[in-house]
Amino acid sequence: MNEIEVDNLSHTNKNVATDNINNNNNDIELETIPNDSNNSNNNNNNNNNNNNNNNNNNNNNNNSNSNDIELETEPNNSNNNNNNNNNNNNNNNNNNNNNNNNNNNNNNKNENNNKIKNEKINILLSIKLYFIQYFKKWKGGEKSPVRADLEEIGWSWLSSFIGILVLALLHYRVTVEKETIFLLGSFAASAVLIFGAPKSPLAQPRNLVLGHIVSATVGSIIRVALVYTNAQTEVACALAVSLAIVGMHFTKSIHPPGGATALICVMSAEQRWRGFYYIFVPVASGSLTMLLTALIVNNFARKRKYPVFWW
């Protein structure tokens, strides 16, 4: 009995122990269940907090980004404004430069126009002054020389008569049968100088002889050219006289009748001389004859002395 009781007691004790253990387990489970719910709640809360924190962080990041963007855009806007201002200033400067250039161009044009006007005015004034001075020359200004006395007039008549008479005798009595001439119209003009104004530089032996020879040479060249080129006679006449004057200038033998000597050679219809024969007869021979007559006749006069110079 005792063993059976002991076994029953042990079974009961075991049952009690198991019950206690079960109760304890239930208690533990009951305790752990709330803990799990709390943990889940806490986890949820933590997750929510994390989400909130993330959201806050995101918001902060967004805010910071927006602030950064604003900070970035603000300098960019300011830079753009500065660039725009600089561009405007540059445009204004360019406009000012263009205006200045236009003003300078206008000023230059005005200056050029003024210069042209002034030049025209100066040209007109110079032309006016030139013609004023030109027509003033027509007035002369010097007194005319006094008339020669009767003695001088008498000797001029006598010497010129003798000089032309000698040439006429040679022309009509000596050379006419040989179809040559000895008397030219230009010798009459030479007679006026060497017999009427023997003191004139144009009447001296160099001028008388060399002037006629140079002019005859020019006239002969022009006449030969006229024959072979069929040039205009009018031009040939003008060239003969003008070139004869140039030749006399170069040889210091200006003698006004020399121009007539050159002209006669070109205008003569009947050419009684061939080639350059005209230079020797009648020009050189006639001028030397007149020189000899002047030397003889002029020096008979009391107040005359001929020549003043020879060469």
UniProtKB/Swiss-Prot annotation:
Residues 95-124 form a coiled coil. Residues 1-113 are annotated as: Disordered. Residues 37-67, 76-111 have a biased composition (Low complexity). It is found in: Membrane. One of its GO terms (cellular component) is membrane. The chain crosses the membrane at residues 150-170, 181-201, 208-228, 235-255, 276-296. This is Transmembrane protein DDB_G0273707/DDB_G0273361. Its main location: membrane. Keywords: Coiled coil, Glycoprotein, Membrane, Transmembrane, Transmembrane helix. The keyword Cytoplasm does not apply. It comes from Dictyostelium discoideum (Social amoeba). The keyword Glycoprotein applies. Residues 9-18 have a biased composition (Polar residues). Glycans are attached at residues 8, 35, 38, 62, 76. It holds the Pfam family TM_HPP. It is a multi-pass membrane protein.
